[in-house]
Amino acid sequence: VSADRGAAPTAAPATVAAPPAAPATVAAAGGAEREPAYTVERLERAQDLPRQVWDELAPADDPMWGRDVFTAMQAAEIGPDAYAYLLVREAGRPFALLPLSAVHGLRLDRVVGPRERRLMAPVARAFPRLLRVPMLFCGNFLGQGHVMGRGRLPAAAARLLVREVMDFARGHRLGTVVFKDFAPDGLDALRPGLDEQGFFTVASLPDTQLTLGQTDFESYLASLPAKPRRNARNKLRKFHRQENLRMEVLDEFGHLVPEMMGLYRQVMDRADQTLDVLDEAFVRALSDSTAAGAGAEDGDAEGQGDGDGEGARTEQRLVACFEGERLVGYLHCLFRGRGAVGARIGMDYGLAHRARLYHNLHYAAIELAIARGCRHIRFAQTAYEPKREFGCALVEQSYALNHTGRLPRTILRLLLPPALEAARAQALAPRS
C-alpha cells in the first residue's frame, strides 16, 4: 500500500491473483453450466477506476460514496495511513469494488465509550503502545459500509473477495480486519466468504436517517408529533431572537475553512469517540474536486469526464451560521442523486446553547434537502436523542470482525462484543 496518500503511484495497479484453492471458474450446480470467471485486482487509488465505472458501481443516492470523497481521503490525514481498492471482475468486466483503509496504529482508547476509556487510562499512560493496534477497515472509513457493485455479490465472488482481504491484511501486517458499518443485507451477501474465513459480527452504532417527501419545511414541521413539533418551533424562535445571528447556505466556502476547522475541533474535543478526525486538507480537497464539475481530472483513467450522469458527482453545500461576519457554526452537507448527508458539524460552544445552534443547523440542512428534492438525509452516529426528535429512524448496521492470528481472534471474540455492546447501549440511552 502506498504510504504517500497524496501522490499518484508510478507503477501500474497491482493484480492480486486468486489462490490456487479457489479456481477463477466455478461450475454451477450439476455441472451443466459454468458460472462467469471472477478475478480480483488491486488498485492503489480511487482515480485508477474510471469515473464512469465508479458511478455505475457506487450507491446512487449515498453522497459518502462519490469518488470525490475517496480522493479527498487519499489527500488528507484523517486516520488511515494508506488506501487500496479491490476490484472484482466478472468475465473481465468490472463487477464490484471494495475500498480498504489501513490504520497501523489505531488508538483503542479513542474508539470506545467513556467508561471503557477511563478503565484504559492507566494503561494508556504507562504503556501507550499497548493500546495501538494495526487494523484494516473494509468499506467506507467515513460512512456506511458497502461493496460497490452491479448487483448482489455471488457466493463465489464473495468467497474470493474476503479471501483476498485476509491475504492483504496478512501481507501488510494488519492483524485486525473489520467490515465497518454494513447493513444486514450487505453482510448477508458477503456471508459465504465471512463464514469461510471465521468472521464474527457485532452490532455497531446505527446511522440516523430522516425520510423526506414534504413539499417544504413548514410541511415537515407539521408532520412531526406534537411534542417534537412544539420543541422545534420553540428552538427556531430562540434562534431568531438572538441579535446579529443569521443562517446562510454557501456553495463556495474555501475562505472559511480555517474557521471551520476551529469550530470542528470544539466538537471533537467533546466527542465520546473519535475514529476519524477530518483535517483541512480533506475539506479543501473535497471542495476542489466537487467544484471541478464534469471536466477531466489529473490521474483520471478516462480523462474525458463524459461518464458523469446528472447528479452522479458528489455536490456540497455549507449550512453556515454567522454572528456578524464571524462564523459560529456550520453543518457540511453532501448530496448525490436523491440522497443527502449532514457529514460534519462545527460550533462555537460559547453561544451554542442559548442559540440552540445544533438544532437550528440541522433544521436548515433539512430545509435545504427538501428544497433539492432529496428522498432522505442522513446524519452522524452521535446525539441520538435530538435526531429522534427530528423524526430520524435508526438504520441498523454491524461490524464483521476477524484477526489474522488464531489466538488473537479467540480473544477478540471473547472481549470485543461485550465492550462494543456496552458502548452502543450507552450511546443510545435516553439523556432526559
Spans of features found by a protein language model:
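Active-site/acyl-donor-binding loops of N-acyltransferases
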Residues: 2-9, 27-38, 102-105, 144, ...
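Intrinsically disordered, low-complexity terminal tails and inter-domain linkers enriched
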Residues: 5-33, 292-313
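Intrinsically disordered, low-complexity boundary segments flanking structured domains
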Residues: 1-8, 24-32, 120-136, 165, ...
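A conserved beta-strand-loop-helix scaffold within acyl/acetyltransferase catalytic domains
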Residues: 36-116, 166, 175-353
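Short C-terminal domain-edge/linker segments immediately following a structured domain
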Residues: 71-74, 117-119, 126-133, 208-212, ...
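Acyl-donor binding region in acyl/amide transferases
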Residues: 81-84, 89-90, 95, 101-201, ...
